[in-house]
């Protein structure tokens, strides 16, 4: 599915899907109708009168309707409202649960983080990084706030590897950490800890 779908504007949604179904073959029309219903899509309307979002829905139905083993989608939620984006996410997860592969291109990193198991980052036409999302986030910086019962010295925390930006605000210690928090927690456990707040990293930080 291309990012900007351009197709036969004089056909209705049903006619367009029938055209592609005849090329591909083996389409389950009940499943196709279900996809259209999930997107609240009226397939009786002519393509040229549809909004950008509805054209995108037609494209998504066309991409999913024959249950391909590999889906290649470029900016698939382009033009979709938030509710329809959520529906697409569910459909993508269903496909992967069934053992099919979804290859997704997107500039919306929150969307990639929500759907993908692995992520590749392309810069100037070259893949500069490819890794599982969980592993990538584990390497990212996270913000920690440790609330102590009373003020503590920051010296021991400043000396820990991977820990930076350490400062205290009364009895609250703030820091940024890369990687494991084990060493930090061991130091903190020497004092009376009231609460720990962790601001988890997202892909936008990487």
Walk through the language-model features, giving the residues of each.
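Short active-site oxyanion
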Residues: 17, 143, 172, 193-194
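ABC transporter nucleotide-binding domains
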Residues: 1-123, 127-129
């Amino acid at each position: 599915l291309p990012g900007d779908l351009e197709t036969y504007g004089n056909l209705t949604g049903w006619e367009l899907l029938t055209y592609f179904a005849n090329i591909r073959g083996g389409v389950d029309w009940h499943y196709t109708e279900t996809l259209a219903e999930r997107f609240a899509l009226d397939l009786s309307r002519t393509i040229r009168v549809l909004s950008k979002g509805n054209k995108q829905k037609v494209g998504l139905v066309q991409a999913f309707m024959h249950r391909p083993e590999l889906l290649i989608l470029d900016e698939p939620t382009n033009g979709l409202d938030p509710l329809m984006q959520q529906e697409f996410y569910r459909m993508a997860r269903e496909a992967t649960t069934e053992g099919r592969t979804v290859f997704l291109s997107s500039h919306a990193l929150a969307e990639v983080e929500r759907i993908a198991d692995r992520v590749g980052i392309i810069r100037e036409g070259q893949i500069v990084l490819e890794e599982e999302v969980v592993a990538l986030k584990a390497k990212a910086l996270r913000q920690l706030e440790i609330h102590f019962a009373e003020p503590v010295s920051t010296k021991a925390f400043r000396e820990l590897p991977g820990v930076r930006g350490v400062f205290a605000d009364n009895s609250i210690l703030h820091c940024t950490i890369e990687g494991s928090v084990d060493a930090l927690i061991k130091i903190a456990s020497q004092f009376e800890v009231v609460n720990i707040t962790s601001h988890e990293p997202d892909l936008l930080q990487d």
